[in-house]
Amino acid sequence: MSKVSGGDSKNTLYCSFCGKSQHEVRKLIAGPTVFICDECVELCMDIIREENKSSLVKSRDGVPSPQEICGVLDDYVIGQQHAKRVLSVAVHNHYKRLNHAAKNNDVELAKSNILLIGPTGCGKTLLAQTLARILDVPFTMADATTLTEAGYVGEDVENIILKLLQSADYNVERAQRGIVYIDEVDKISRKSDNPSITRDVSGEGVQQALLKIMEGTVASVPPQGGRKHPQQEFLQVDTTNILFICGGAFAGLEKIIGQRGKGAGIGFGAKVQSVEDRRTGDILKDLEPEDLLKFGLIPEFVGRMPVLATLEDLDEEALLTILTQPKNALVKQYERLFEMENVRLTFSEEALRAVSRKAIERKTGARGLRSILESILLDTMFELPTLEGVEEVVISAEVVEGKARPLYIYAERQGDVGTGA
């Protein structure tokens, strides 16, 4: 029985799980000889929810349906329905291909690597991170900007397979069924349209090195990193069944697409629309493989990623939803931070819309929302721990626009009236 007797606290009840008193939590629920607080109940629900998601892959002979995968992505990623469908179908087919290969059928199913293209802050990396939470196959994320050709300072492409091995606890058979996400792949584009006469060790050279592992080869992977321990034995990993997903912002690609589309309208009746009048996501929908070649990807590299998925710009409504709806929503995070100071944080709807508009103006997408909120709340978070009696902080649209200070509402004490500062 979580009850303390003696002194002033003889009637105080405590949670049997976390030990917090009834005064530290919103609700304390009594059971036979035990108590549980609302915070522990929420934690238990989160644990059960995560276990349900991780057991997603147990349905239908171990193959989750595209709708099930897309449903989990919807919990964390706002919008981008087309990209979610592409990823869901690709992962579903990846599972089916693995099961098909295990049955030694006469038809060989080839994998379809994916290239995700979209403006910065639209959710490419978050989609990959969310996939990693729910999949029952080894998953790793790599950064293309750190890769160089073998023999130069930087990471070899084999290090990607090493990370996959580590996520599979060095089980080679499991690693050979995994999924690899390579981020910032646009940063390894060729530095000019023409083949370089000098060594491009972090651009075209990396693309050449990635070709074989993406298509399928037996890679020799040093378990401790090849350059530091040259005498170690190598592990042999077959990359034929590893699914590769590449993502990048490809800044400037919309201009290449726009130049190609300029010749479409001729004559008095032609509709002419400048690239500036269209949003980046809309322009990217007209993407053709030849545009990627002009951007600096080599033909062989583009050919190994047959599935192209473009992501859209996030509009004001999408950014507003990102601020408030997901489990890791920024507004919820800051509300919890203020709760730790026993202060309620309130945003007006107009304030949240002003934050969304500011992110659109900066062209930083969802990634820029946190920096905007930080700048708005910086002075308040600095002053709050030393202020007494503050019950609520209200953020209005004027505060976001820099025309006013946050409103502080004080608790009434012995007849005093609350004031705003």
UniProtKB/Swiss-Prot annotation:
It comes from the Bacteria. One of its GO terms (molecular function) is zinc ion binding. Residues 3-56 form the ClpX-type ZB domain. The keyword ATP-binding applies. Pfam families: AAA_2 (PF07724), ClpB_D2-small (PF10431), zf-C4_ClpX (PF06689). ATP binds at P119, T120, G121, C122, G123, K124, T125, L126. SUPFAM superfamilies: Glucocorticoid receptor-like (DNA-binding domain), P-loop containing nucleoside triphosphate hydrolases. The keyword Chaperone applies. InterPro entries: AAA+_ATPase, ATP-dep_Clp_protease_ClpX, ATPase_AAA_core, Clp_ATPase_C, Clp_protease_ATP-bd_su_ClpX, ClpX_bact, P-loop_NTPase, Znf_CppX_C4. One of its GO terms (biological process) is cell division. Keywords: ATP-binding, Chaperone, Metal-binding, Nucleotide-binding, Zinc. ATP-dependent specificity component of the Clp protease. It directs the protease to specific substrates. Can perform chaperone functions in the absence of ClpP. Belongs to the ClpX chaperone family. PANTHER family: ATP-DEPENDENT CLP PROTEASE ATP-BINDING SUBUNIT CLPX-LIKE, MITOCHONDRIAL (PTHR48102:SF7), ATP-DEPENDENT CLP PROTEASE ATP-BINDING SUBUNIT CLPX-LIKE, MITOCHONDRIAL-RELATED (PTHR48102). This is ATP-dependent Clp protease ATP-binding subunit ClpX.
